[in-house]
Amino acid sequence: MVTLEAEPSPFVFDVGRTVLLVIDMQNDFAAKGGMFDRLGIDVSMIQAAIAPTARVLESAREQGIKVVYLKMGFRPDLSDAGLPDSPNWRVHSPAHAGEPVRAPDGTES
């Protein structure tokens, strides 16, 4: 059992029965040239979450907590994004969803 001091009360959990979910921490949302950037959304607040998230991941791994990553994605042709008049198409088509994005290290993701 691990106890984290927190407000309004300490949080106690069993690391053997706990996973850390990391949701949507992906280059397409946070990187320059990614989907949000192409939509004109300021990604600086998303980028500001990267370092704290990395610290949480490091701490979780040190405690033996399993990490599960969930990410949003579509096929390049958006065939799995719903019907052409669906919200996914209206939002993701102008954002060029499905196009490759360069990660900060230069790799394509």
Model-derived regions, located:
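Short, flexible loop segments at the rims of nucleotide/cofactor-binding pockets, characterized by
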Residues: M1, M45-I46, P104-D105
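Short coil-to-helix leader/linker segments, especially the first N-terminal amphipathic alpha-helix
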Residues: M1-F13
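Active-site alpha/beta core segments
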Residues: P10, V19, I50-S109
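A short, charged/proline- and glycine-enriched loop
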Residues: V15-R17
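Active-site flanking residues adjacent to catalytic metal/cofactor-binding acidic residues
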Residues: I23
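Short acidic, Gly/Ser-rich segments with clustered Asp/Glu that frequently serve as metal-coordination loops
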Residues: Q26-A31
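Short amphipathic alpha-helical segments
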Residues: G33-M35, A81-G82
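Short glycine-enriched, charge-decorated loop/helix-capping segments at active-site entrances
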Residues: M35-M45
